[in-house]
Amino acid sequence: GSAFFNAMAQKLGPLMFFMSGGRKGDRACFGAAQALDILGLNYASSRYDADAEKYPNRMMVGTETMVADLPYNWERVKKYPQLIGDFVWSAWDYLGEACIGDWTYYSYHGLPLFAGQGMIDSTGKPLAAMYFMQIVWGLRKKPFIGVRPLNHAGESPSTGAWQFTNAVDSWSWQGYENTLAVAEVYADAASVRLLLNGNEVGRKPVKRYRAVFHVRYQPGTLCAQALDENDRVLSEHSLMTAGQETYLTLSPEKTKLRANGQDLCYIPIEFTDGNGCLKPWIEQKITLTVHGAAARLAGFGSALCKTDEIFDKTYHDSYRGRALAVLR
């Protein structure tokens, strides 16, 4: 089915890119392009340059692409007026096509459930890829720092092509002091300077809106400065370590429900410090109790792609310090 072909496409990525731009791809597209106002292309961005030259009146749109290819694709969207847009798969994570995008660690047990390829996870939290896209699109001027999970340092994940990173926007990894961290910085700049507690860790050129640093974890403030060609600071972004105290923080989206049996209230549940700073290394079981006859628990879970837990139970493990409950 679909999951099988997606898995094959992941393995054959470079070959698929080459083949979609070849003569067979041209013949396959020709009839459809003649019949349609706009030709939709899935994972065929290798066609953009040649088709724009060969068929200048052909309207095209990238109907399904990978986030890692966005810098290449968006450059061509801006260049060719007949290429009207690019749709990255996918915005919100979903059930099915299980784990084809997830960066799976073997220490996680359970059956594959979510696809793991959304730019927003199943609990509604924007992931690093979302901020990367905003920077490429020109919607975010500040750089963004993402840190690969230190609670899995030393493990080699099974990666998926549809999710180009598993970095999280946190510098809170209690118990992992001196562990070598991988920090990814996304920026629309000539170079990036990374500082830890005011001390320069390194400076790197930005390639395809991305620079990667290796730094030993120490609590404090991790700051990325986006620099122009003359080393002038354009903007910066910082991550701060959470405090020692830990709270289980519930943040309901609303406090009143209509008594119609259909109204829902989504409640993010997070392990935080007193200022609401998330602690993503905390992954432990949470048990909920709903009091009163007017409401019931409609669902409870986390964004973990592999789990044997189900959504209609009152207990669930947090994932990256977070879970989501839904009241009806």
Segments (PLM) and residue ranges:
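Acidic/polar low-complexity surface segments
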Residues: 1-15, 301-316
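Substrate-binding clefts and catalytic carboxylate motifs of secreted carbohydrate-active enzymes
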Residues: 1-262, 274-278
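Aromatic sugar-binding surface patches on proteins
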Residues: 205-211, 306-324
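A glycine-anchored, Pro-Gly-centered beta-turn/N-cap motif
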Residues: 218-220, 284, 321
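Short aromatic-acidic-glycine turn motif
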Residues: 245-250, 288-306
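Core beta-strand segments of extracellular beta-sandwich domains
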Residues: 267-269
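Short, ordered, surface-exposed loop/turn motifs in non-cytosolic proteins
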Residues: 280-286
